[in-house]
């Protein structure tokens, strides 16, 4: 792999939409070259982006926002595969102790979490008019741990109003069984180890800025209006 160190440095400065500073224009062709090479080698593509076009037409979240969001998600998939390719090559060259390897290894979890969180998020949307069955095990667990559904929803909403970029995840502690609304900074800060993600809401600006400007509360209302509760309840093992 030619000029690997330059490509690695280029990757460190690449961005996905609204995520980080743009790539240096002189290094961009190298990153594109490596991405093109990996696209031609199926063995370097273990992850493929899912199609969520069925969500288009959702009330409260525009097609413009969704299409932009889909492209961003596809970028995380591409970068995850690209990182795997670079890390594999660095390992083959015996460069595991190099700063490039160590920084890209650190970056991998950020990109990978960006893939999986988006997949969980898109998958729990598309349920216009859907309601949580009050007799379901999930609803009963919510009442047990928060007192009422409304108290849980308020806590989830207020968690989504925390300043910063990230996610809100309703986690289940698989050992204690407890439900916990959790703030995730960016993609990788604050996850509950071993936790089971039940409901996921994206609160990066790209999820709502085009439709709601800085009105995050309006976006959160639209999110709840479109939750696919059938999918969410299936994530809860009871």
Regions found by a protein language model. Give the residues of each.
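Feature for soluble, non-membrane regions of globular proteins
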Residues: 21-238
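Bacterial N-terminal signal peptides
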Residues: 6-16
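Positively charged n-region of N-terminal signal peptides that target proteins for export
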Residues: 1-4
């Amino acid at each position: 792999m030619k000029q690997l160190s330059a490509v690695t440095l280029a990757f460190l400065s690449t961005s996905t939409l609204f995520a980080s500073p743009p790539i240096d224009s002189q290094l961009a062709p190298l990153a594109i070259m490596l991405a093109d090479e990996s696209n031609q080698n199926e063995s370097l593509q273990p992850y493929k982006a899912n199609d969520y076009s069925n969500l288009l037409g959702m009330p409260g979240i525009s097609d413009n926002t969704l299409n932009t969001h889909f492209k961003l998600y596809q970028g995380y998939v591409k970068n995850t595969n690209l990182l795997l390719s670079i890390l594999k090559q660095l390992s083959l060259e015996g460069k595991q102790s190099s700063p490039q390897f160590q920084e890209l290894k650190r970056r991998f979890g950020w990109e990978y979490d960006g893939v999986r969180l988006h997949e969980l998020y898109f998958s729990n949307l598309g349920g216009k008019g859907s309601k949580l069955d009050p007799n379901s095990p999930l609803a009963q667990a919510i009442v047990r741990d928060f007192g009422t559904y409304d108290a849980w929803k308020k806590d989830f909403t207020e968690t989504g109003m925390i300043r910063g970029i990230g996610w809100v995840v309703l986690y289940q502690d698989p050992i204690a069984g407890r439900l916990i609304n959790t703030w995730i900074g960016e993609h990788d800060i604050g996850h509950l180890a071993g936790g089971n993600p039940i409901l996921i809401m994206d609160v990066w600006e790209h999820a709502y800025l085009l439709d709601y400007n800085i009105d995050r509360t309006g976006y959160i209302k639209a999110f709840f209006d479109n939750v696919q509760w059938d999918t969410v309840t299936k994530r809860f093992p009871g």
